[in-house]
């Protein structure tokens, strides 16, 4: 009976949401525990070769269900298994207290089908136009009353957290004493309560029931963990989630933001999150983990300094995970960059370089311009501190927010008076890094940069563009030679707009861009999108382009709710999705983007050889055999014993040995090349080692002196 009781205690996860490992229920059902234990010990079938990084970092549903409970701090970091290193993204933590158990992983309970490595938006995206439905706190979704605290999700279907159903929140709905799920109030640290209350004051989404639950799960998972800045790790989780909330992310994304490091840095597993928060959140957290592991590989191999390979990583990040997971990773990196001062100068340089070459362009691909600007400026500060200080001093008085606001008000009134309606009127300051880059590229001084301040106006039609241009020139004096008519004379990539530079108050130049809705959509999501035309001429396949455009659109659409841009048109007439661009995906909208089997462009594959990673481009339909041909059928290498050996390369595709060399490579595949020593070389090695051993015995005999004759 004692043995059976012990098995029951340690074969199941805690029964309540925030229980500690010290609270053990004595109400045991030995029969049911025994069966669940045996089922959890059953081995799962061997995983087939599946393309993509999603196969490299195996999901919980295809891992072996036989796992032992062990402390996280004793885990072995083995490069061949590509385990995640907690040093990634500023995780220099000290574990003053942590949980000494790992919840059982009920792998066979929730089996998921293998998905293609190229999948975007795994979880459902809300596109409902109906108002949010109020959910009673006393009833389940199916109308039944809750029978107890453990029935929180009774009646919820899988992926309910990703649906368009939302709560109508009250101002005090986030208090602990109103929670409908069990919470051991005595175990909650005072700093955690204060952190939650401050977050609720900053954004209303932190009053959401699922967000509060995720907050306390994150507190439990990261309890005792500290960052290099000596702040509690929980604070980083909250700041990451806050960044997501501030750009309009829904509760599913915010919950995943709170839990984004739990799989890598705590006892939590994919199945634990799946049981408590649903597949939508679990998939996002798993996606962030995969991105972190790829980021670590790239940083260890200095990929950021290899321009072409860094460019290939951008579509690969979007190919291997949900676009919203990329968004969470960007928020994680942005907050890490804000606290980069806590690391050594060497680490600051390394992280800043990676961020500038990989993450800032990725934010640009997704259309999150505010994050792109912040990331670039923070990188500029750490990579070029002297130039950053100099630019900051020179432009300290130039960044006049009041001037931009005044210009918007002035133009708005003039447009109304002229009877010109518009969709968007917004202003911006050019970032420090953008100004510095433009000065270097075009060899200009600060006074010669005329687009430090800018306005953008989006109107109905082409005729209104020219009418609005006349209004602008009537308000401010035009700078001669700075009018560019890209409507009549489009750029080579199809970009169309009117650009003009005027002088505000006679001293400060102000650039004004005027375009129609169609021109704006083409510039942001279509062929003219500037993220496509990075220097170096890196060209993406049509499938990758469509995938990135869709991800960019979804992120922009989700963030539109937080836009503060002025409009003279009702919201029902605002900019609509570009139906002609995403015709192929609207059939399943808002489901995830489905890969196109007729991919005709290049694929990017990660090749690991001699513990070094490279991102290589292969034509469509390339095979493992083609990769080996490029690497060479074999190479003559000199061994440590001076014996030349012809080594054959033995490939592993996504951690699985390859027997069929005709297997086609897919976007995001990881191929490890290890040398296979022929039998004749092994014979020579053994003979040489035997001779060395014999010489060693001769030297060690009594009376024998090395280097002296007898």
From Swiss-Prot:
MF terms (GO), sorted A to Z: ATP binding; GTP binding; GTP diphosphokinase activity; kinase activity
Enzyme class per UniProt: transferase
Pfam families: HD_4, RelA_SpoT
InterPro entries: HD/PDEase_dom (IPR003607), HD_domain (IPR006674), NT_sf (IPR043519), RelA_SpoT (IPR007685)
Transit peptide range per the UniProt entry: 1-63
Localization terms from the record: Plastid, Chloroplast
Gene3D superfamilies named among the record's database cross-references: Beta Polymerase, domain 2, Hypothetical protein af1432
Keywords: ATP-binding, Chloroplast, GTP-binding, Kinase, Nucleotide-binding, Plastid, Stress response, Transferase, Transit peptide
Cystine crosslinks: none
Positions of the HD domain: 233-337
BP term (GO), one: guanosine tetraphosphate metabolic process
Catalytic activity: GTP + ATP = guanosine 3'-diphosphate 5'-triphosphate + AMP
Gene Ontology CC annotations of this record: chloroplast
EC number: 2.7.6.5
Record flagged with keyword Transferase: yes
Key word Ligase present: no
PROSITE patterns linked: HD
Membership in a protein family: Belongs to the RelA/SpoT family.
Function: Probable ppGpp (guanosine 3'-diphosphate 5'-diphosphate) synthetase that may be involved in a rapid plant ppGpp-mediated response to pathogens and other stresses.
Protein name stated in the entry: Probable GTP diphosphokinase RSH2, chloroplastic
